Amino acid sequence: MAANMYRVGDYVYFENSSSNPYLVRRIEELNKTANGNVEAKVVCLFRRRDISSSLNSLADSNAREFEEESKQPGVSEQQRHQLKHRELFLSRQFESLPATHIRGKCSVTLLNETDILNQYLDKEDCFFYSLVFDPVQKTLLADQGEIRVGCKFQAEIPDRLAEGESDNRNQQKMEMKVWDPDNPLTDRQIDQFLVVARAVGTFARALDCSSSIRQPSLHMSAAAASRDITLFHAMDTLQRNGYDLAKAMSTLVPQGGPVLCRDEMEEWSASEAMLFEEALEKYGKDFNDIRQDFLPWKSLASIVQFYYMWKTTDRYIQQKRLKAAEADSKLKQVYIPTYTKPNPNQIISVGSKPGMNGAGFQKGLTCESCHTTQSAQWYAWGPPNMQCRLCASCWIYWKKYGGLKTPTQLEGAARGTTEPHSRGHLSRPEAQSLSPYTTSANRAKLLAKNRQTFLLQTTKLTRLARRMCRDLLQPRRAARRPYAPINANAIKAECSIRLPKAAKTPLKIHPLVRLPLATIVKDLVAQAPLKPKTPRGTKTPINRNQLTQNRGLGGIMVKRSYETMAGAGVPFSANGRPLASGIRSSSQPAAKRQKLNPADAPNPVVFVATKDTRALRKALTHLEMRRAARRPNLPLKVKPTLMTVRPPVPLPASSHPASTNEPIVLED
């Protein structure tokens, strides 16, 4: 029962999602709501997976410095990987969560130089922290102060003087006497002078306009004049005047008016005092943060002095009593039963044996963390299309520590080529940036799974806006910049305004001429006619004339097909369909063919420039070239006079056989 009893100050696990790791929080308050439920006000602690990569690099450098200074024993890569899961970052962010979402207790300690990091791996539910994370400023700062050692920060203690040895140092330069206990005045005379000093201070506050506003009553003015700063000034006046009461009295009341001594309690306004109380409630006695966030116009010494004076006021005593009474009325502890509901990520296979559910889930897959194939329980992990899973022990580790036991290949470690890659805990840009480290077979599998078919279906109003608001939409310019945002609301509003005023004439529709099926079949057959088989032993002659043939203008600006760019053509049969894999066409040479992987298809298209295209580029004007670039799928119409036809270069007689339509093959 003690394990399910949670008190204020405990570090606990909170579950906000069935598939995400637990949240580590510290209970600050337990409050009962109006409907009877219990809510916990908690302090947020963050994992490494919750902060940016730049802050992770900063944490790594801090960890290396700690290991060097504390002389930590060496650890393996797997242990270092698991130690990152045990590191947390404290914050000053509070939130309220239902107490029913608590899933267990854990331990979080401040890392110090005497700790050995390996000990954290031997303990269950044990974490450490050394840095504080600010979710608003996105910064990491040290949680504990630094002790500065050296002659710049500490006083140099001189050697002890021997008996009878005199100190030759000038004491007047080293110290100043502020009070002489052997003065000629009696204690009664000193007390009477202090009473006169308080009366002078009260009279001075009555004459001061700002003080009369802050202390409107005589009682408050007398209380302010009785504080230490008035008494210290009176005793210092006696010391400076040689304990002559007449001279000291005339110093307290000069010709211009009585001397007014104020401390920090009087210098601060009521609004500044309220700000200080609010900051003290949020940050505690962290005066640097109080000054930085709430009172930047005050000095640190002024804030510290005001704090200790504020603790002597009646307001502080009343607040302290109210907080004590409120704390007594609040809950000190709460009992949360053990959570026994099944997890939605649990894999249940139909027809599996008892105790081995998930056995029929993609047989052959292993645990993404420990790579085991046997487990009493399996859990789905990562994106659904990845079909990744974790065993029972690795799932508990994932929920508690926010990572896998072993580093995956996407995290920089080397794994086997047959192991699946887990990307569920990475964002999409990180997974894409790490894809070169994967093998080609698994990368093709990932790409094939991620390619989803989608359909863009436009509404009637959108199709009307393309024509009516062409000046605002600029469809050609938008097509060249597909990632630039378009203000759809403004275009929709403008289209609604122009629609009633638009002409009612029907649009001219250009009918699409569709060729009959017989014509299409003839064209497909003509593209790849069957060739007679070449008998074995005969070498395919090389057509030297093909190397010097000029390319016609019709195929210069035509976009090349993927087969041409890939370096190997796809064979076609007589009916125009591509041949099945493994069947060699007669039109292809006997050289070794490379099977293309659809997942490795290149995204960019490469255009090879020849002498003809360069001459064509010079013949075109700038406007014609831009128009052709906007419509690369249309043939380019060029006047024959613009192109200079080169005379054919005579070739020497070749002893090779006649030219053939077979492609050129160069054997290695």
From Swiss-Prot:
<dbReference type="Pfam" id="PF01426">
    <property type="entry name" value="BAH"/>
</dbReference>
<feature type="cross-link" description="Glycyl lysine isopeptide (Lys-Gly) (interchain with G-Cter in SUMO2)">
    <location>
        <position position="508"/>
    </location>
</feature>
<feature type="modified residue" description="N6-acetyllysine">
    <location>
        <position position="522"/>
    </location>
</feature>
<feature type="modified residue" description="Phosphoserine">
    <location>
        <position position="435"/>
    </location>
</feature>
<dbReference type="GO" id="GO:0004407">
    <property type="term" value="F:histone deacetylase activity"/>
</dbReference>
<dbReference type="GO" id="GO:0000781">
    <property type="term" value="C:chromosome, telomeric region"/>
</dbReference>
<dbReference type="GO" id="GO:2000736">
    <property type="term" value="P:regulation of stem cell differentiation"/>
</dbReference>
<feature type="modified residue" description="Phosphothreonine">
    <location>
        <position position="534"/>
    </location>
</feature>
<dbReference type="GO" id="GO:0008270">
    <property type="term" value="F:zinc ion binding"/>
</dbReference>
<feature type="modified residue" description="N6-acetyllysine">
    <location>
        <position position="531"/>
    </location>
</feature>
<dbReference type="InterPro" id="IPR009057">
    <property type="entry name" value="Homeodomain-like_sf"/>
</dbReference>
<dbReference type="GO" id="GO:0000122">
    <property type="term" value="P:negative regulation of transcription by RNA polymerase II"/>
</dbReference>
<dbReference type="Pfam" id="PF01448">
    <property type="entry name" value="ELM2"/>
</dbReference>
<keyword id="KW-1017">Isopeptide bond</keyword>
<dbReference type="GO" id="GO:0006338">
    <property type="term" value="P:chromatin remodeling"/>
</dbReference>
<dbReference type="GO" id="GO:0042826">
    <property type="term" value="F:histone deacetylase binding"/>
</dbReference>
<keyword id="KW-0238">DNA-binding</keyword>
<feature type="domain" description="ELM2">
    <location>
        <begin position="145"/>
        <end position="256"/>
    </location>
</feature>
<keyword id="KW-0597">Phosphoprotein</keyword>
<dbReference type="GO" id="GO:0005654">
    <property type="term" value="C:nucleoplasm"/>
</dbReference>
<feature type="region of interest" description="Disordered">
    <location>
        <begin position="580"/>
        <end position="599"/>
    </location>
</feature>
<dbReference type="InterPro" id="IPR035170">
    <property type="entry name" value="MTA1_R1"/>
</dbReference>
<dbReference type="GO" id="GO:0042659">
    <property type="term" value="P:regulation of cell fate specification"/>
</dbReference>
<keyword id="KW-0832">Ubl conjugation</keyword>
<dbReference type="InterPro" id="IPR000949">
    <property type="entry name" value="ELM2_dom"/>
</dbReference>
<feature type="region of interest" description="Disordered">
    <location>
        <begin position="647"/>
        <end position="668"/>
    </location>
</feature>
<dbReference type="InterPro" id="IPR017884">
    <property type="entry name" value="SANT_dom"/>
</dbReference>
<dbReference type="GO" id="GO:0045944">
    <property type="term" value="P:positive regulation of transcription by RNA polymerase II"/>
</dbReference>
<comment type="subunit">
    <text>Component of the nucleosome remodeling and deacetylase (NuRD) repressor complex, composed of core proteins MTA1, MTA2, MTA3, RBBP4, RBBP7, HDAC1, HDAC2, MBD2, MBD3, and peripherally associated proteins CDK2AP1, CDK2AP2, GATAD2A, GATAD2B, CHD3, CHD4 and CHD5. The exact stoichiometry of the NuRD complex is unknown, and some subunits such as MBD2 and MBD3, GATAD2A and GATAD2B, and CHD3, CHD4 and CHD5 define mutually exclusive NuRD complexes. Interacts with CHD3. Interacts with CHD4. Interacts with GATAD2A. Interacts with HDAC7. Interacts with MBD3. Interacts with p53/TP53. Interacts with MINT.</text>
</comment>
<comment type="similarity">
    <text>Belongs to the metastasis-associated protein family.</text>
</comment>
<protein>
    <recommendedName>
        <fullName>Metastasis-associated protein MTA2</fullName>
    </recommendedName>
</protein>
<feature type="modified residue" description="N6-acetyllysine">
    <location>
        <position position="152"/>
    </location>
</feature>
<feature type="cross-link" description="Glycyl lysine isopeptide (Lys-Gly) (interchain with G-Cter in SUMO2); alternate">
    <location>
        <position position="492"/>
    </location>
</feature>
<keyword id="KW-0863">Zinc-finger</keyword>
<dbReference type="Pfam" id="PF00249">
    <property type="entry name" value="Myb_DNA-binding"/>
</dbReference>
<keyword id="KW-0007">Acetylation</keyword>
<feature type="domain" description="BAH">
    <location>
        <begin position="1"/>
        <end position="144"/>
    </location>
</feature>
<dbReference type="GO" id="GO:0016581">
    <property type="term" value="C:NuRD complex"/>
</dbReference>
<dbReference type="GO" id="GO:0051276">
    <property type="term" value="P:chromosome organization"/>
</dbReference>
<dbReference type="InterPro" id="IPR000679">
    <property type="entry name" value="Znf_GATA"/>
</dbReference>
<feature type="modified residue" description="N6-acetyllysine">
    <location>
        <position position="460"/>
    </location>
</feature>
<feature type="cross-link" description="Glycyl lysine isopeptide (Lys-Gly) (interchain with G-Cter in SUMO2)">
    <location>
        <position position="559"/>
    </location>
</feature>
